[in-house]
Amino acid sequence: MADSKMKWGQAWDSSLGTATTSSSSATGSPSPFQNIRVPDTRAPRVAHTTFTLEAFECLAASQAGRLWKQVRQFWVDHFSRRFSPRRPPLRHISSMSTFYLLDHRTRQAELGLNYGEPRTRLSDEAFVFRGGRWTPEGKRASARTPLPSSTIPAWKPQVQPIKSQVLLEENNYLKLQQELLMDMLTETTARMQLLEKKVDADNNPAAPARSWKRKMPKQRGAGVLIIQPRALESR
């Protein structure tokens, strides 16, 4: 009985599931596995399916491993490295002489600075600064050299109109600056008053009702800046 079972098992393993019936020759009794018949196609299909699944798992594992290696390499190449640019070359320290300690003539000779004489133009007339004075362009060192007493009356009438013209231009410029400063002061005072009113309206709860009543006069006078006498007194 045991021999027949072993023979039947060996036959099943060798043929991948195809069983063969064998009888016991020693006892002559019929084997209990004679009438058992197993289908021939089920075991090969199961084995083939198992082999296919194992192959697919191996293929998927290899592809996943390859993809994971690529991701890790991409991360190492682009994200894991610190930003370390190359250092620039060191500057060569050059020794410079202290030109600012030199006087004007030596510095001008060393650096080649030659700006020329200052020039300006007032009322369609050009002037040159020579010898500490503004003289009309074209006249040379006549004003620099001392003149005799006989030529002083003839020289004074020429310098007087020029000096008066320069002073007049300077006076007009100062007046213009004064007007500009007054306009800026007026605008600043008006803005300060508006800010004070806004702060008072935020602190006082009854202020919105009064500000609503003032909307109509403000709309009528839009574009016109009304300056109160207090702003002028502050100036």
Curated annotation (Swiss-Prot):
Functional description taken from the UniProt entry: Plays a key role in the correct positioning of the annulus, a septin-based ring strucure in the sperm flagellum, serving both as a physical barrier and a membrane diffusion barrier that separates the midpiece (MP) from the principal piece (PP). This positioning is essential for proper sperm motility and function. Interacts with CIBAR1 to form a complex which localizes to the curved membrane region of the flagellar pocket. By doing so, may provide stability and rigidity to the periannular membrane to prevent membrane deformation.
GO biological process: spermatogenesis
Membrane-spanning parts: none
Keywords: Cell projection, Cilium, Differentiation, Flagellum, Spermatogenesis
Residue ranges that the Swiss-Prot or TrEMBL entry lists as coiled coil: none
Top-rank taxon: Eukaryota
Region (Leucine-zipper): 167-181
Free-text disruption phenotype from the record: Male mice exhibit severe fertility defects, caused by kinked sperm flagella with the annulus mispositioned in the principal piece of the sperm.
GO cellular component terms, semicolon-separated: sperm annulus
More about this protein: 'Chibby' is Japanese for 'small'; the gene was so named for the RNAi phenotype seen in flies.
Tissue: Testis-specific.
Subcellular location: Cell projection, Cilium, Flagellum
High-level lineage: Eukaryota, Metazoa, Chordata, Craniata, Vertebrata
Stated name of the protein: Sperm annulus positionning complex subunit Chibby3
Predominant location: other
Annotated region described as Disordered, given as residue ranges: 1-41
Amino acid composition bias (Low complexity), ranges on this chain: 14-32
InterPro entries registered for this protein in UniProt: Chibby_fam
Subunit text: Homodimer. Interacts with CIBAR1 (via BAR-like domain); both proteins form a ninefold symmetric structure at the flagellar base; are recruited to the annulus in a mutually dependent manner and regulate annulus positionning.
Recorded family membership: Belongs to the chibby family.
Pfam families linked: Chibby
